Amino acid sequence: MSDTNSAWIEQNLQRQRKMLEDKQKQKRHQSAGSVRTTTTTSSMSMNNMKDYPAFETSLPFSMSDHTSNMNTPLIPTPQAPPRNHTLTTRQSSMPATDTLIQINDYPENDISAKLSKVNLTPCVVSDDEDSDRRSYRESPWHNDIVADKIKTDILPDYNYIKNNLQKFVDEPAQEHCLYRCSITRHKSGVDKTMYPTYYLHLEEMDTDKKAKIFLLAARKRKKSTTANYLLSTDPTNLSREGDGYCAKVRSNALGTHFTIYDNGHNPKKTDNQFSIRQELAAVIYETNVLGFKGPRKMTVIMPGIEPGNDSKPAVRCIHRPVLEKHTLLEKNRSGDTNSLKVLTNKSPQWNDETQSYVLNFHGRVTQASVKNFQIIHPNSPEYIVMQFGRVSEDEFTMDFRYPLSAVQAFGIAMTSFHGKLACE
C-alpha cells in the first residue's frame, strides 16, 4: 500500500512539474519576439527617477551618464531567428546612432562569441563547482572583444581609502561613485577545499598600472554548525580576536537565509547595550521546493540610510535588535520594512538560441556561473547597486556603489559562495 502511495505521489509531482514547465515555456515564447532598446533619453531617465525614488537622495547619475551602458539592458534573442536576423545595441560613445550586430557573422556553434558581442553572460543553474568549471571550459570566451564598462561620475578617493581603511569599509559608498573590485579565492593547506580564503581588492582606475588596494579578507570558520564567515581588514589574522575583525556572515541550516553582523556581541552574551552587534544586512535566497532548476532569486534587506550633504557623508542607521522579532529577517517576513531598504537581484532573461539565462554585466563578468548576480532597487531596475560574477576558476569581480558599504557588499558576495541545499 505504501508503495502505491509513493508511486502516486511521484506521478503527481511529475505532472505538476510538467505543467509548470509548459507554462514557463509558453511565457518565454510569448515574450521572445520583442527586442528591447538599449538606452533611454536623459529626460526619460530623469523623469523615471523622480517618479520612483529608490533612495532618500537622487540617484547618482550625471547628464552624461544617461547614455552610458548602465542603461544597457539585456537583449533577448527570438527563438529560431532567421538567417539575416540582427540585434541593435547602442554604444555609449555614439549616443545618436545605432550599431548593428550581425548574429550570423560567427560560426553556428560559437555561442560564446555571439553573447560576448552583446555583453551577455550566461548563468548556469547548478551550485556545483564542477558544473561551473565545465560551463566555461566548454564555451570559452574571447579576450580580444572590447568589453563594455559601467560609467561613473567620479573616481574613489584612493588616498583616503588607504589611510582610513577600517573606517572606509564600514561606511556607505560615496554617492556618484562606482567601486570596481576583484575577489580572489585562495586554496591552500589540507582543508583547502572546505575553507578557502577570499581576498577583496579595490581596482585603481586612475592609473595604467592597474594597481589594487587590499580592502578585506574572509574565511569560513571551522567547527561551526552553519555557515559562518569572518571578515577582517587584516589578512594575516582572520579571527575574532584580531584587530582587523570587522564583521561576520551567518546562515541558517539550509543556507537560504544569511545575516551580516558587525563585530559586536550577541545580545544574549552581554549586558552593555552599546556593545550589542549591529545587523548590517540580511540576504534571502528563494527555495525551489518542487526541484525546478533556474536562476537564484535573492532579496537583500539592509538598515536605512541618513542621506549626506556637502558637509557630511551619508550614514547608515544603527540596527541593534535584541529580540528575534526585531531582526532584519523577521521584519521583512512580517512586512515591517518602512525604515529599511529592500533590494532584489535583477532577473536573468531566457535566451532561446543559447538555451540559457543571460545577464548584461557590461564586460565585467566573463564566465557562466550560478553565483553571478546583479542587485537592483525594484523601483529603479537600471541602477545597478552591486554586481558579482566569475572571470576564472578562482577570480571574481565585485562592483558596488551607494548605498552599500564594502563590508556589506563583500558579505553579500560570501553568501553566494556558500552552497544552498534547497535552492538547486
Swiss-Prot record:
Predominant location: cytoplasm
Low complexity bias (residue ranges): 37-47
GO BP terms in the entry: chemotaxis; lipid metabolic process; positive regulation of neurogenesis; protein localization to cilium; receptor localization to non-motile cilium
Keywords: Cell projection, Chemotaxis, Cytoplasm, Lipid metabolism, Sensory transduction
Compartments, record wording: Cytoplasm; Cell projection; Cell projection, Axon; Cell projection, Dendrite
The organism's place on the tree of life at top rank: Eukaryota
GO CC, any one term: cytoplasm
Region (Disordered): 19-47
Spans through the membrane: none
Gene3D superfamilies documented for this protein: Tubby Protein, Chain A
Family according to the record: Belongs to the TUB family.
Entry function: Has a role in fat regulation independent of daf-16. Implicated in ciliar sensory function which is required for normal sensory behavior such as chemotaxis. Functions in life span control via the insulin/IGF-1 pathway. Thought to be involved in neuronal trafficking.
Subunit details: Interacts with rgb-3.
Full protein name: Tubby protein homolog 1
Name of the gene this protein is made from: tub-1
